[in-house]
Amino acid sequence: MKKVSPSYLKHQFLIAMPHMHDENFAQTLTYVVEHNANGAMGLVINRPQSLTLADVLEQLRPELPAPKRCQEIAIHAGGPVQTDRGFVLHPSGQTFQATVDLPGGISLSTSQDVLFSIADGYGPDQNVITLGYAGWDAGQLDAEMADNAWLTCSFDPAILFDVDSDQRLDAAARRLGINLALISTQAGHA
């Protein structure tokens, strides 16, 4: 018997199906940072909060006023796990104290210096900043996929960096030729 390797979803988008009722993930687009036999980690990239980079900087370095442009940089709700921890997706090329290069020419930075560099004008111009992440135990995401909770879409940096947050979910679905408004909210298996 031939052993089949599991199919992992690292570096793909997860599109929440319309029947997703979990408020943490309903109508979300999630970038999968890691997916292996031990579980998965992703960042929801289409849920901006009312919190801005200026608000975060006020907490991190209150002695310095945040530049006005920081009031325009939204902080996204990246998921329900460790909602006080920050993550920044940005194009590869700049390295910070805690930066991991990911496939497709993007990086994930988790140290405060990336936020300071963005605020001070020498950080990555293209970025998605989140607080929190989505986490799945071993086999959990695979089970959700089998239950038709998610669609997958290949990663596209334009969706991440060039499309407004509120349009990212539909943009990813369009890459698949799908209009989410036309999909039933009832889950099922054929």
UniProtKB/Swiss-Prot annotation:
Top-level division of the source organism's lineage: Bacteria
Signal peptide: none
Stored SUPFAM superfamilies: VC0467-like
Cross-referenced Pfam families: DUF179
GO cellular component: cytosol
HAMAP family, per database record: UPF0301 (MF_00758)
Family to which the UniProt record says this protein belongs: Belongs to the UPF0301 (AlgH) family.
Protein name: UPF0301 protein PSPTO_5037
Organism of origin: Pseudomonas syringae pv. tomato (strain ATCC BAA-871 / DC3000)
